[in-house]
């Protein structure tokens, strides 16, 4: 008994000073945006501790080949940070180790690392988790990012509002099947938001949206957004850096179209102006001209199925070259909507059809982008 107590007492001392290696990048299920059809760069970063004279080595292991160990020089404080170029695809297995005199002193790994396509998804409830049925990833090749961590992209999508279904799992599956690479999403949609609520703080507008949680009235009677949604839009882009994701997918418009109080309805001319402002200002803040897909969105319920004014405003952004043409989700009616066709959100079949419509818009454009590089 005395021997056991002694060993337990000195165990922390024995462990103290043991060589250690850890990874801060990549994280599990992280997707890196590929630069060309054929390759992309993975950031491998971490730190070592209590390893004087030891060599840091890293490698990415694919399903068909192990890959060579690559020596990395650690800074005096023990940090290391490099980029490794590899063929597009995944999942890769990232490994890092400490060696000295032919012996492995410590090692660590990350199981799922992808080089593929990343999309930021923004807008209101039908861009988020408010569909009738939660969707699941079928391919095993789709993940999403919640500001801090990556996860398999099963609904609900962390980072967006709501706790039910979205179109992202089936869209990711469709794109992964088409392009043969992992797909990543950055979900930031907020249910019930007007385009006015996505404006930067300090941009005045004449009348508030129906819900006023994210806006406030100015002394002169006009209104402004609190800027939180815009800040999130910009900060996510900045996290990934210039060309660190492929495009923004914007799905929004219901909360600006045909409101019960007509004074809360946004004229199409202002919708076009405000969304154009959001696109331009977010590009400037992010430091690059991220492509935007803008869907046609204004459907509420049967009998209130479209606003020509809002639809024309959305289409005007395509025609001006400020945005790319997204799907026409107003066309999804009947049993593709929740509650047997009575609601504004999508049913399970509607979410899958919504995903298919997005894939139809994204695929030819993405093929063209990949052919240019």
Segments (PLM) and residue ranges:
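Cell-envelope and extracellular/periplasmic
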Residues: 18-373
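Bacterial N-terminal signal peptides
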Residues: 5-13
């Amino acid at each position: 008994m005395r021997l056991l107590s002694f060993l337990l007492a000195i165990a922390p001392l024995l462990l103290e000073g043991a060589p250690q290696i850890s990874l801060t990048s990549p994280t599990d299920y992280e997707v890196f945006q590929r630069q060309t059809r054929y390759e992309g760069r993975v950031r491998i970063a971490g730190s070592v501790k209590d390893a004087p004279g030891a060599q840091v080595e890293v490698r990415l292991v694919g399903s068909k080949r192990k890959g060579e160990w690559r020596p990395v020089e650690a800074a005096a404080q023990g940090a290391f940070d490099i980029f490794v170029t590899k063929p597009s695809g995944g999942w890769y297995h990232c490994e890092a180790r400490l060696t000295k005199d032919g012996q492995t002193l410590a090692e660590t790994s990350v199981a799922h690392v992808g080089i593929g396509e990343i999309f930021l998804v923004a807008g209101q409830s039908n861009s988020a988790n408010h569909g009738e049925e939660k969707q699941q990833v079928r391919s095993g090749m789709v993940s999403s990012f919640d500001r801090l961590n990556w996860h398999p992209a099963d609904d609900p999508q962390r980072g967006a509002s709501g706790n039910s279904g979205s179109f992202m799992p089936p869209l990711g599956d469709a794109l992964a099947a088409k392009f043969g690479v992992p797909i990543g999403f950055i979900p930031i949609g907020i249910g019930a938001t007007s385009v006015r609520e996505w404006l930067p703080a300090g941009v005045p507008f004449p009348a508030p949206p129906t819900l006023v949680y994210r806006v406030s009235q100015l002394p002169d009677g006009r209104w402004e957004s609190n800027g939180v949604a815009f800040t999130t839009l910009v900060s996510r882009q900045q996290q990934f850096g210039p060309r660190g994701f492929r495009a923004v997918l914007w799905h929004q418009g219901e909360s600006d179209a045909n409101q019960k109080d007509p004074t809360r309805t946004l004229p199409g001319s202002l919708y076009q102006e405000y969304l154009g402002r959001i696109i331009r200002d977010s590009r400037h803040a992010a430091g690059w001209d991220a492509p935007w897909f803008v869907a046609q969105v204004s459907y509420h319920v049967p009998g209130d199925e479209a606003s020509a004014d809002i639809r024309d405003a959305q289409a005007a952004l395509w025609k001006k070259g400020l945005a790319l043409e997204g799907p026409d989700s107003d066309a999804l009616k009947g049993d593709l909507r929740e509650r047997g066709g009575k609601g504004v959100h999508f049913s399970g079949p509607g979410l899958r059809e919504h995903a298919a419509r997005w894939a139809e818009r994204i695929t030819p454009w993405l093929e063209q982008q990949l052919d240019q590089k």
